[in-house]
């Protein structure tokens, strides 16, 4: 029987996961309805919809995976881990893609590379989304293949009844998977980190110029830049904490029955849940859609609903 602290953290984790699934389900539903009614989505909304869908699945798989492991259904965990690897990789890549898109479209750098990308990024987004899907699929296939080979090797070595050899092989495989996960996770995270930092630097420079021309603190443009910088800072913090939490969790030093494991899971998934909240709050369209959500009104209606006109 789990201890009282463990049960408390399990309850918090499940409620957090359900809230995050509801939040991301709202994003997918609103953007999906807009695409169905208007037959189009902006490039940024395409990335947000893909990111929300991957996070919805990630929270669901994480909740199922942790509950199965805590209930001693260990045979099902390796299969659930395959889905978790897929949706976690998609979440990292779509987060990086969204940060790179905003960096290219909003930043004011005069370098020729940024000028070239600014004109072509919108047309490249569908290809980048397909490329992210292919990369994540290859990552999952290679990871699943490695796990299968490790399982077969472990079974063959156990027949020799040499526990020391089995332990060494297991330790070497764990080190390999840790380094492999660290490598494949680091690529999208570095893209996200560089894009977000560059965008923050660009906005700070623009804000400094604007304050020189309009010294008033209540200027609407100045307030808009300040709010954008705050949301970017929160996004940077939450996504960085999620990435670091993944590394700590890959070390597998916490037992599933230990209540600290569940506390750690609450912390990990709270970061991406809060980042999804930032995405909703910084989008006027989604904020207005949230207010009118109970009515389920058509996104192609009047501009008062916040979706604007649907162009053919």
Swiss-Prot record:
Q: Which residues are glycosylated?
A: 162
Q: What is one term from the GO cellular component aspect held by the record? A: plasma membrane
Question: What CDD domains does the database record attribute to this sequence?
Answer: 7tm_TAS2R16 (cd15017)
Q: Which InterPro entries match?
A: TAS2R
What role does this protein play? Receptor that may play a role in the perception of bitterness and is gustducin-linked. May play a role in sensing the chemical composition of the gastrointestinal content. The activity of this receptor may stimulate alpha gustducin, mediate PLC-beta-2 activation and lead to the gating of TRPM5.
* PANTHER family given in the database record: TASTE RECEPTOR TYPE 2 (PTHR11394), TASTE RECEPTOR TYPE 2 MEMBER 134 (PTHR11394:SF69)
> What is this protein's name?
Taste receptor type 2 member 62
Naturally occurring in which organism (per UniProt): Pan paniscus
Show the taxonomic lineage.
Answer: Eukaryota, Metazoa, Chordata, Craniata, Vertebrata
